[in-house]
């Protein structure tokens, strides 16, 4: 079954793949990395003016990584705003995706966290650097193939 956004994108010949609906009935679409920036701008123009969240996950050990976006179309007087989930799957060997910071400023820390934990590089992000781990940290802690170092820093409790 095709949702309203998917139907709208099909009419305009914009490449995407429908992944169905989640348990809340929110439409989920897959967009290719190379199409992501232009589709993001189109979503904003279409009315998705609120980036609810951005996250990322490791699909499988040695497999793809995914950058996930949840958008809401907030309009005055609407009780049930339209929502959509976008997934962009990336090769583990070179996980690069255009940043949407310049479209939704709230993507700033969220993209940095995905970079810090999974190593996804967001092209044209103004401050893409680690946000949770020290700059000297080696590796990407939330990848399923990550091997944790065999040391733990003991902090003074005083």
UniProtKB/Swiss-Prot annotation:
Gene3D superfamilies: NADH:ubiquinone oxidoreductase, 30kDa subunit. GO terms for molecular function: NADH dehydrogenase (ubiquinone) activity; quinone binding. One of its GO terms (cellular component) is chloroplast thylakoid membrane. NDH shuttles electrons from NAD(P)H:plastoquinone, via FMN and iron-sulfur (Fe-S) centers, to quinones in the photosynthetic chain and possibly in a chloroplast respiratory chain. The immediate electron acceptor for the enzyme in this species is believed to be plastoquinone. Couples the redox reaction to proton translocation, and thus conserves the redox energy in a proton gradient. PANTHER family: NADH DEHYDROGENASE [UBIQUINONE] IRON-SULFUR PROTEIN 3, MITOCHONDRIAL, NADH DEHYDROGENASE UBIQUINONE IRON-SULFUR PROTEIN 3. InterPro entries: NADH_DH_suC, NADH_quin_OxRdtase_su_C/D-like, NADH_UbQ_OxRdtase_30kDa_su, NADH_UbQ_OxRdtase_CS. This is NAD(P)H-quinone oxidoreductase subunit J, chloroplastic. It is found in: Plastid, Chloroplast thylakoid membrane. It catalyses: a plastoquinone + NADH + (n+1) H(+)(in) = a plastoquinol + NAD(+) + n H(+)(out); a plastoquinone + NADPH + (n+1) H(+)(in) = a plastoquinol + NADP(+) + n H(+)(out). Its main location: plastid. It comes from Pelargonium hortorum (Common geranium). One of its GO terms (biological process) is photosynthesis, light reaction. The lineage of its organism: Eukaryota, Viridiplantae, Streptophyta, Embryophyta, Tracheophyta. Its EC number is 7.1.1.-. Signal peptide: none annotated. NDH is composed of at least 16 different subunits, 5 of which are encoded in the nucleus. It comes from the Eukaryota. The gene is ndhJ.
């Amino acid at each position: 079954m095709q949702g309203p956004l998917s139907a709208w994108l099909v009419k305009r010949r914009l490449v995407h793949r429908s992944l169905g609906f989640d348990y809340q009935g929110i439409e989920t679409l897959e967009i290719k990395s190379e199409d992501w920036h232009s589709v993001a701008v189109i979503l904003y123009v279409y009315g998705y003016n609120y980036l609810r969240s951005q996250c990322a996950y490791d699909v499988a050990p040695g497999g793809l990584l995914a950058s996930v976006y949840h958008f809401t179309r907030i309009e005055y007087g609407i009780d049930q705003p339209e929502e959509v989930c976008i997934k962009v799957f990336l090769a583990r060997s070179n996980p690069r995706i255009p940043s949407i910071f310049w479209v939704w400023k709230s993507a700033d820390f969220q993209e940095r966290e995905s970079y810090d934990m999974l190593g996804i590089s967001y092209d044209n992000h103004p401050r893409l650097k680690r946000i949770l781990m020290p700059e000297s940290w080696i590796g990407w802690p939330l990848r399923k193939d990550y091997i944790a170092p065999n040391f733990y820093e003991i902090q003074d409790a005083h």
